[in-house]
């Protein structure tokens, strides 16, 4: 049995996580808990073989040496958020603001939206988020796309913001990665106990 803690990056993803776990053929291999993640999470008392997290939380866990599979943000996730933003209001300049591991990779997004100036503001420390949002606003961006906390902070400054959502495929891939990492860890522990 694999003890798994899934840090939900935003409240709306909770049903998706539950559904994906229940539909997996190996769902009986997991004893899981879903925890609503929050800004600047200290990540104390994680009682699991492995965790799943996204953005700053995944980065912090990796830095602290906590076993973590990342809920990866795909280029498709970013494109879907930008399209949603465009449906809400016309814009000329868009800022992608968030954790480095969430907003850095979609460099080809400029090719899909040639009429919009898209600037990426990748951040390593979550505490830099508000400062980077202020910078994006000061530099004349019409809207912001980012994670849950980015959207909450953007609302404070009255700038339109859309959250990057993770789909079922990303959730399933993160669970598969977590299972594989936990099984490798179990085998390594067994080997070290034999020695």
Q: Each predicted region: which residue ranges?
A:
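Non-catalytic structural scaffold of enzyme domains
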Residues: 1-195
């Amino acid at each position: 049995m694999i003890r798994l803690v899934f840090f939900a990056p935003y409240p709306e993803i909770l049903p998706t996580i539950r559904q994906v776990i229940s539909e997996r053929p190996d769902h009986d291999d997991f004893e899981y808990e879903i925890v609503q993640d929050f800004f600047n999470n200290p990540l104390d008392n994680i009682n699991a073989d492995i965790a799943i997290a996204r953005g700053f939380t995944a980065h912090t866990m990796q830095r602290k040496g906590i076993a973590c599979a990342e809920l990866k943000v795909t280029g498709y996730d970013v494109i879907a958020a930008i399209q949603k933003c465009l449906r809400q209001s016309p814009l000329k300049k868009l800022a992608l603001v968030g954790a480095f591991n969430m907003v850095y990779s979609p460099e080809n997004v400029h090719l899909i939206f040639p009429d919009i100036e898209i600037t990426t503001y990748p951040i390593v420390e979550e505490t830099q988020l508000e400062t980077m949002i202020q910078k994006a606003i000061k530099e004349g961006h019409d809207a912001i796309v980012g994670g849950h906390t980015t959207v909450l902070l953007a609302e404070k400054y009255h700038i339109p913001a859309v959250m990057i959502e993770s789909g079922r495929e990303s959730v399933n891939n993160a669970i598969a990665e977590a299972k594989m990492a936990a099984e490798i860890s179990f085998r390594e522990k067994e080997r070290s106990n034999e020695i």
